[in-house]
Amino acid sequence: MDLHEPLNMTMLCDFYELTMGNGYFAHNLKDRITYFDVFFRQVPDGGGVAIAAGLEQVIDYINNLHFSEADIAYLRSRKLFSEEFLEYLRTFRFTGDIWAVPEGTPVFPREPLMTVRAPAIEAQLIETYVLLQINHQSLIATKANRVCRAAAGRTVLEFGSRRAQGSDGAIVGARAAFIGGCAGTACTISDQLYGVPAGGTMAHSWVQMFDSEYEAFKAYCETYPTNATLLVDTYDSLHSGVPNAIRAFNEVLRPQGITKCGIRFDSGDIAYLTKKARKMLDDAGWPECKITVSNSLDERLINGLLDQGAQIDAFGVGERLITAKSEPVFGGVYKLCAIEREDGTIVPKIKISENVGKITNPHYKRVYRFFGRDTGMAEADYITVYDEVVDDTQPLEICDPDATWKKKVMTNFVAKELQVPIFLGGKQVYTSPTLPEIKQYCKEQIATLWPEVLRFDNPHNYYVDLSYKLLGIKMDLLNKGHS
């Protein structure tokens, strides 16, 4: 294999997807239509809501699925796969259907983010890559959204490339962070590839390159007069950094009539330093000078800084965002929920576990979000069997699937189906929105959630309920004890 050639992502799959595929082929199951759901069981960080992301990369992957001759040769060398199966892979393409929630959608545990209907081998082979993208980007988008909500309207920039877990973690991580609410990134290639606004100013090395801190600041202001944000903590933040920044602003920017500028702190007692610096800047006639801070920040630390009255206009958030350090796994899974007989009958399937949280919801399903007709606020999500009709002109009783005595009657609501068709018959039917449109959609949808759902500590458990028909099918399968 030529390591300088681009990797074929079709081979980015768990090996057992291929061994199962070979087995399906051998037992005449390759054309059996299957239904798989992608869902997750728990919101990271004990939160009340997650953000779906990663769909665009899944679309690109599905559109380019194929096995190269080099792939076939490698698989043949393993001496596990029949020649008939390898010949099948030579012309392999995805021919199934995929429905998914749009990127930026707030989502909740155990509801389908994506549903795949496809022949068994096709549905099986895409599992790994689908989960890789949705898990990673949903994790980062969710973390970014928490950080941005903590910032309470202040600018948040993604600064984490150098601490990301690999190049892809940095590149698509910046994309996901933008969806979650970040204003931009330090990762240049994410701007080039996806249009995530890239920006940056200086490192401590810039300051150290000059004979004095003042000369470093003056040179930077001369080079970038309309984008002068100076890093003031290389030596002594309050006794040299801020005074030298003010001097450079006075001597270089003020004569040009430029009033917009900034300083950044990357260390020290941020709350104390920003309050002192704000007064120094204001007293020197620089009220428009923005203060940016960084230094291993996350939503909890940002909350704490603002509670202390820190004077901050923007946050640069790095390693704890791009790695989702506090809980670095999203936990999405890809589970069979139904198969289709030759006569078109759909047979529900269930995964049973002694761990109640790991019992799956069977059948080919639809998921709806109920919004208050008067308030526009999201009140509950409702999962039904695919052929059920939801009439939002009539009262509807819903119940907790784990505690069926907990019931709620929905009235005066509007039902919106969350999943939209992405592929039908192997052809893409979905027009992807632009990245800024996805970000705006996320912002708008988060605004439909009550504060009780969004709070960081002990959030309200948002209702995700099953229809009585679906609940009955699930209980019947549980009682039978088989799938």
Regions found by a protein language model. Give the residues of each.
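Gly/Ser/Thr/Ala-enriched C-terminal appendages of enzymes
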Residues: 1-32, 36, 41, 45-47, ...
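Buried, small/hydrophobic-residue-enriched core segments of structured protein domains
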Residues: 1-35, 42-44, 80, 86-95, ...
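N-terminal, Lys/Arg-enriched amphipathic/low-complexity engagement segments
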Residues: 34-90
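Hydrophobic residues within beta-strands of alpha/beta enzymes
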Residues: 199, 263, 291, 313-315
